[in-house]
Amino acid sequence: MRIDLNCDLGEAFGNYSFGGDNQIIPLITSANIACGFHAGDENVMYDTIKLVKDNGVGIGAHPGLPDLKGFGRRNMDITPKEIYNLVVYQLGALDGFCKVHQTRINHVKPHGALYNMGAKDKNIAHAIAQAVYDFDSSLILVGLSNTLLITEAESLGLRTASEVFADRRYEDNGQLVSRKEADAVITNTEEALDQVLKMVIENKVVSKNGKEIDLKADTICVHGDGAHALEFVSQIREKLTKEGIDIQSL
């Protein structure tokens, strides 16, 4: 049994810095690097790719909606064509810096609102998947387990990775509880660790209402920001290793 640990990185821009990328990178196996629309800029992309490559971590593009002020977490009234083009644009930007560092993109994971819109809207899911396929059909598309983004990508012949979340609660339909709700994020470490093991070993998760949901877990999203982020990720790694689960990149 194996699992990937992924984290969203490179989300600083200009004079603004977020999270502790230097500390979290050695603990993960895949990095989702912001491409300049919701966060990140040309200097941050350059530095982050170098850091990720030097640590032997898989490089992923993390395209988002063009919304710096909202950190890409606000829905936008945007057409599938616009979605397609903004994904291609951001992949091209990150790919350029990968070429400079003599490495390549391994996977793509949409960010924030784009991720959630793709999970629920078939047309948007198809636009994201088509953009990835047309850019490089060998890339892996990461999406929320059991959602439209995964099925649309697979219908095109793309490889996919079904993602689960260590510290997020789930609705009865398998969607993530909105961050607007007070209980969306699991703050108790033991509860989060128990959820991780259930998802990875049993392929199940218990919703906020107590319903047991089947899911597939190829990769676990962990977060590098917050006061106890590093300790939390270390505990996840330790728990998985004790259960005999290999932690490997996609």
Swiss-Prot record:
Disulfide bonds: none annotated. It catalyses: 5-oxo-L-proline + ATP + 2 H2O = L-glutamate + ADP + phosphate + H(+). GO terms for biological process: carbohydrate metabolic process. Gene3D superfamilies: Glycoside hydrolase/deacetylase (3.20.20.370). It comes from the Bacteria. GO terms for molecular function: 5-oxoprolinase (ATP-hydrolyzing) activity; ATP binding. The keyword Hydrolase applies. InterPro entries: Glyco_hydro/deAcase_b/a-brl, LamB/YcsF/PxpA-like. Keywords: ATP-binding, Hydrolase, Nucleotide-binding. Coiled coil: none annotated. Its EC number is 3.5.2.9. Forms a complex composed of PxpA, PxpB and PxpC. Belongs to the LamB/PxpA family. Catalyzes the cleavage of 5-oxoproline to form L-glutamate coupled to the hydrolysis of ATP to ADP and inorganic phosphate. This is 5-oxoprolinase subunit A. It comes from Staphylococcus haemolyticus (strain JCSC1435).
